[in-house]
Amino acid sequence: MTRRFFSLISALLSMLLLLAMPVNAEENTSWDKQFQTQITEWKDAIANRDPGFKEWQHSQTEIQTLGANQRQWLVSIKKSGKQVGYLVVGETPNSDSDPKSKFVLLEYGLGEYILFDDAFAPREIAAEPVYDGFASHWLLTQNPASHMVNAKTGEPYPTAFVANEPVMRTLPSNELVHSGQRLTQTRLLKQQEADPFDQIGWVHQLQSTSEITWKQLWQQQEGSSITLTVPLHHSKVLAPFVVSSLHLWDDQNAYVGVWDEGLRFVPYTYAKKVGHFYLNQTSSPAE
């Protein structure tokens, strides 16, 4: 094969690459615009409907990817240089009939300390963020053994603890908030952050098989004490959370807000799948 023929092939390949670059750049720009538009819509919808999120108004966002090839992003919400909350956004697979990206709202929270906060992040370079609702963690894979660190509190777990199979990604997209939906109803139960051990009626109900439905949750009055317990890492840990607020999107998609170093909202269908709700009947630890 002559050198001239090699030069011709090289020129053709270079031309094809140059022709493809504007297309790829245009696709990336379109995706970025869709993503930014969507997170702004959700942020404003929450801030304008729930007075507790008023600080989100006129705020700024920073975005980071969660894990490798997970199609999940952490959106840090800041105002005047201070963190005031976060969103966790996922992307559903595109279809040939609808190539437009479809984003879903996996979780959102309020407060100074967000999920995967740098203040609690392990200093090891090999720490990988792994998102799965309440089971979210940093995975440290360095020798001699891998172990996990709680993504909300920075608490390290023993090396013997192993994560369950992810649950959040198994939820149908129609059970999650998606593009075009509005926050239509809110219900406040506990305005101030509370410790689940301040009222321990739920401890005496751990063996109960009765279920609290969404309708029953929604009917509770402000001041009601509801505890959500979630077994983590193959039931090595039982994590209790006090329910603070309830959100309803388009009057159909329900999210539950719990106190956990700040306020965090997860889909009700997820919370019900991984945990159990208890209505506390006692008023103090002594009881």
Residue positions per predicted region:
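Short, non-transmembrane alpha-helical segments in secretory-pathway proteins
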Residues: E26-L66, G109-A126, S173-T229
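Soluble extracytoplasmic regions of secretory-pathway and membrane proteins
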Residues: S30-Q38, W42, Q83-G90, E107-I114, ...
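A short, surface-exposed interaction/processing loop segment used at functional sites
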Residues: L87-A135, V149-Q185, A254-E287
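A eukaryote-biased signal for long
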Residues: Q185-E287
